[in-house]
């Protein structure tokens, strides 16, 4: 019984807005071995209301007070990106495991600071790129890994969104305030797309682009056009226009292979279209989403943290793929994902499963946040695929695509 208590993940939530209320917090209380121990909001009354709604025993209106709570052993940072670095550094210094909302920070340097702090403190760092664990994205990975569309050649992202003048001009809309978000809607939305492509195709080695503000509704960029190349050799292009006509609203990713093509939306539906030379008539897979969309990812984080705690917070040998673009002192993410399959059935020729390793590679680190270790052949592969290192790569690519920091 005492051992089970030692494995309990007791969350402290900092920031409890709409994302937290719907996508993540309820899941934390539903997952075995996980519970919310405390919540913090700047307005005490709102914190108290949130605590009452989710049966949370303690609430705070000060982040430092929550971080000092001895019952909290993991912190979920659900504030705008502008405060992610500061709060992550404080959480790491307090010895708390960290799960931070996406995008990870406003820029790549802040991401690196967060990784370094967690490495020095010896605590895990995870980022809320939850799409990696959803059934539609697991099906995409399964199909690609099984070679159903052959060798992947290229990828194109197209996103057109019309303006919403009242909301876009709202001072409370932090997503278009660079000092709070790092950029505009591109940073908020494209980060999901670029993160998944990193997971699917490996790290990007080159990226460049141009960005501008066409509608002058807010300070951040509202159109981005760019190109990128992955370590695997796949080339990609993207166009993100947040000033488009309503009649041309679009959201589609096209992944072209030597034997077929996959197409799917990021936000406009939960389906995947497949066409191959062998089966030219399109096959559409439909998927049901979990009630709380972050739950599959949070489940993997809880299980991984429990493993870490059972090993007395020592290094667990894990495989990972080291990108050339990151400093040698930083450990990388693991290459595996949690076992499971998509809800929709695959075509007859889609052999394989979504829990296979992404890519081969040498390993000399655990990949939590960078502590030393080893990874021999046959060692357990990480359950959680979304770490500080993978998320930092996404920030790096976004900076290059917007022309802020060329790669």
Residue ranges and their predicted role:
Residues 1-54:
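N-terminal Rossmann-like dinucleotide-binding module
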Residues 1-8, 34, 74-77, 306-346, ...:
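C-terminal helix-rich "cap/oligomerization" subdomain common to oxidoreductases
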Residues 20, 60, 100, 125-127, ...:
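Hydrophobic residues in well-ordered beta-strands that form the structural core
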Residues 54-117:
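Beta-loop-alpha module in the N-terminal Rossmann-like domain of NAD(P)-dependent dehydrogenases
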Residues 113-130, 151-153:
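Rossmann-fold dehydrogenase core element
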Residues 131-217, 322:
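Predominantly a Rossmann-like dinucleotide-binding segment in NAD(P)-dependent oxidoreductases
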Residues 194-269, 298-337:
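Contiguous beta-strand/loop segments that form the cofactor/metal-binding neighborhood of enzyme cores
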Residues 339-377:
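Long, intrinsically disordered low-complexity tandem-repeat segments
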């Amino acid at each position: 019984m005492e051992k089970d208590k030692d494995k309990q993940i007791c969350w402290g939530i900092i920031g409890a807005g709409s994302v937290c209320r719907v996508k993540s917090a309820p899941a934390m209380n539903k997952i075995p071995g996980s519970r919310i121990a405390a919540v913090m909001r700047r307005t005490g009354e709102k914190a108290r209301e949130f605590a009452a709604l989710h049966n949370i025993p303690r609430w705070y209106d000060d982040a430092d007070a929550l971080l000092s709570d001895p019952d909290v052993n993991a912190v979920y940072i659900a504030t705008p990106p502008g405060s992610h670095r500061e709060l992550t550094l404080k959480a790491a210094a307090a010895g708390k495991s960290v799960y931070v909302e996406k995008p990870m920070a406003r820029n790549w340097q802040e991401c690196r600071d967060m990784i370094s702090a967690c490495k020095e403190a010896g605590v895990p760092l995870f980022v809320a790129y939850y799409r990696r664990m959803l059934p539609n994205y697991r099906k995409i990975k399964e199909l690609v890994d099984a070679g159903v569309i052959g060798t992947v050649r290229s990828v194109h992202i197209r996103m057109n969104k019309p303006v919403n003048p009242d909301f876009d001009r709202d001072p409370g809309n932090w997503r278009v305030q660079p000092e709070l978000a790092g950029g505009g809607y591109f940073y908020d939305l494209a980060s999901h797309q670029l993160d998944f492509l990193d997971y699917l195709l490996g790290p990007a080695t080159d990226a460049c682009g141009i960005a501008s503000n066409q509608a002058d509704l807010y300070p951040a960029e509202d159109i981005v056009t760019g190109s990128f190349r992955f370590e695997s050799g796949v080339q990609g292009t993207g166009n993100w226009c947040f000033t488009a006509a309503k009649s041309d609203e679009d959201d589609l990713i096209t992944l072209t292979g030597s034997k077929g093509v996959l197409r799917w939306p990021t936000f406009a539906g939960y389906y995947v279209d497949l066409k191959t030379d062998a089966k030219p008539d399109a096959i559409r897979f439909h998927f049901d989403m979990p009630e709380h969309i972050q739950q599959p990812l949070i489940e993997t984080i809880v299980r991984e943290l429990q493993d870490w705690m059972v090993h007395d917070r020592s290094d667990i040998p894990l495989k990972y793929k080291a990108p050339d673009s990151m400093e040698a002192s930083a450990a990388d993410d693991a290459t595996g994902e949690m076992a499971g399959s998509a809800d929709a059935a695959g075509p007859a020729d889609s052999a394989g499963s979504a829990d296979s390793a992404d890519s081969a590679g040498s390993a000399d680190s655990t990949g939590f946040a960078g502590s030393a270790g080893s990874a021999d052949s046959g060692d357990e592969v990480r359950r959680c695929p979304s770490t500080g290192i993978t998320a930092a790569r996404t920030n790096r690519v976004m900076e290059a695509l917007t022309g802020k920091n060329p790669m």
